[in-house]
Structure formats: C-alpha cells, structure tokens
Design a protein with these regions (language model features):
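N-terminal beta1-alpha1-beta2 submodule of the flavodoxin-like/Rossmannoid cofactor-binding fold
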Residues: 1-96
Length: 96
C-alpha cells in the first residue's frame, strides 16, 4: 500500500486550511493510500531551538534524537503533502 505523510500546520480547527487538510486526508484514504496524518500543533511540536540544543548543534546524534520520530515518519512515506497557510508572504513559524 502506498503511504503518504500529510503534514498540517495551522492552529485553528475552523480554518480554511483545516478544511483543506480534511479533504486531502479523506481523498487519499478513499483512493487507497495509507495516511500518516501529522498535525504539528496537535502533537505539540516544539520548533524553537533551546540553548542546550544550540550548544550541541554540531553533535549529530543529539540533534537527530530530538526529531527522530518525525524523521522516521518521513522516511516511511512514499509521498509528502504539506497543508499550511501563507502568512505575511511565508509559512507558519512551526514549519521553520
């Protein structure tokens, strides 16, 4: 079965992006895709680099450990679909 990682980045469940996200997930599932639905806000993803993380920036094993579950999910996917709004000519901070 083909697997898609759907990455969603919007904090408001009533947003247009949330409706688009639901449509994407539903369409993929109806077409036989296995969907890994990753809502970064719902999963409390922390995009901010802490002092400890910055000081260990060049320590690859330590850097990888913090995001390893997300790396594994991405590597397991055959396709990546990103659903997010464009705010102030860019993507949301949680994706940076």
């Amino acid at each position: 079965m083909t697997r898609a990682l759907v990455l969603f980045a919007h904090p408001c469940p009533e947003s247009f992006s949330a409706a688009l996200h639901a449509r994407v997930v539903g369409t993929l599932e109806r077409r036989g895709w296995q969907v890994d639905d990753c809502d970064l806000n719902a999963e409390n993803f922390q995009p901010v680099l802490t002092e400890t993380e910055r000081r260990g920036y060049h320590d690859d094993p330590a850097n990888i450990a913090a995001v390893q579950p997300y790396v594994q999910r991405l590597r397991a996917a055959d396709a990546l679909v990103m659903v997010f709004p464009v705010w102030n000519f860019g993507y949301p901070a949680i994706l940076k």
